[in-house]
């Protein structure tokens, strides 16, 4: 055993991991991908995209303490989807097509089988998003993390024609707001979720509940974050949307106002969509107020589109063609005085 191994770092486990993930990484290749796994830097050829005035849009994010749920359940094959989703959905909100992705995994001990499961999830997220996994880093840090602990973060870059870049100046008065259904909690609010489940109560994650269709609580909580690229990017390319909001930490209350200018207000009808059972369960179990819920969770809406009234039917048709569940949840109007930028009825 080398002195480095005695110190807790096994470089041979790193080599083993690279061999295990090669197939998954290769499966994400797309137009513009160059090079192979193992290079010092990931490369991508922008010239093949034939974009006249390219604007690069980048995003970086992690999965937060949802990772602790995955580690508690010893289920690591979907958490990578969450990591990709958190990055590429943010990029999509600016109208950009995600091109490539890089991941960063930090752990107390490099277990090649476990890390390969995580990377398999990252690769699945990349395939869903049409983005290439062009690089990554696995850092073994025995004094920083416990043996079975790990953290996961990602970085992605996308591109958009300058004329199609979505900013808060695009949405207009009388725009219709379309909410796209979430798959569950997604990747935000898990510190509160864990407080409710494990500190305020002693919930067994393997318990199956009728309101969850027979799924266990753990399965519902770990449901991967939706990736909206396939259904929304075509709308952007056809100039059918004026704005996009990715509903993450802070829920609708914090994220929707980021989409439009300060002279507008979003009027939201909370009865216009079905709140997912997991949120009703957490609200009751945690004795949460309505404000607590809407300021923390997505409440069943993972993304919101601002659409001109004359383009509404075209958007609805294209979303339906993609089997996207959506709801008309409100509209934008002129803001009166110092009222809030979002009003939920």
Swiss-Prot record:
One Pfam short name: AIRS
Q: In which pathway does it act?
A: Purine metabolism; IMP biosynthesis via de novo pathway; 5-amino-1-(5-phospho-D-ribosyl)imidazole from N(2)-formyl-N(1)-(5-phospho-D-ribosyl)glycinamide: step 2/2
Q: List its EC numbers.
A: 6.3.3.1
Please give the chief subcellular localization of this protein.
cytoplasm
Where does it live in the cell?
Answer: Cytoplasm
* GO terms for cellular component: cytosol
**GO aspect biological process, one term:** 'de novo' IMP biosynthetic process
Q: Which UniProt keywords apply?
A: ATP-binding, Cytoplasm, Ligase, Nucleotide-binding, Purine biosynthesis
Source species, domain of life? Bacteria
> Catalysed reaction(s)?
2-formamido-N(1)-(5-O-phospho-beta-D-ribosyl)acetamidine + ATP = 5-amino-1-(5-phospho-beta-D-ribosyl)imidazole + ADP + phosphate + H(+)
Question: Which leading EC class covers this enzyme?
Answer: ligase
Stored Gene3D superfamilies: PurM-like C-terminal domain, PurM-like, N-terminal domain
Instruction: Kindly give the CDD domains that the UniProt entry links to this protein.
Output: PurM
GO MF terms held by the record: ATP binding; phosphoribosylamine-glycine ligase activity; phosphoribosylformylglycinamidine cyclo-ligase activity
Family named by the database record: Belongs to the AIR synthase family.
Can you say what this protein is called? Phosphoribosylformylglycinamidine cyclo-ligase
Organism field = Ligilactobacillus salivarius (strain UCC118) (Lactobacillus salivarius)
- Source lineage: Bacteria, Bacillati, Bacillota, Bacilli, Lactobacillales
As recorded in Swiss-Prot or TrEMBL, the protein's gene is named purM
